[in-house]
């Protein structure tokens, strides 16, 4: 299965770690540091991705929830996994959908979640 993941993470160290982890899992990984870059990639390549892995707090006007809504508008089949180092109201996930992991990340759990989501997308 050729599964593509879009990673949106503003912390360069975390982004690099996620890239390496997911590439080592055999996934096609595209990563961007911010919302504007994510919107640009999605506008051109949204159908390519089976999974969006996005930080919630990106230090900009848009957050991971905004990116997820845009991604789903362009690719209804995309699965979303949110990550954050900050507390998030669980009711927000009930309305937004998607899976959620807190930082620091359990890399084995993350890899399993991405593969499960990628498998459902195909």
Please state what every model-predicted region is.
Residues 34, 62-66:
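Acidic catalytic/metal-coordinating carboxylates
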Residues 9:
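Conserved acidic carboxylate
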Residues 105-118:
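C-terminal output helix
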Residues 12-31:
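Two-component/phosphorelay signaling modules centered on CheY-like receiver
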Residues 31-51:
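Acidic, metal-coordinating helix/loop segments flanking the phosphotransfer/catalytic sites
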Residues 65-76:
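Short amphipathic alpha-helix used as the core "switch/output" element in two-component signaling
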Residues 55-56:
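Active-site residues of response regulator receiver
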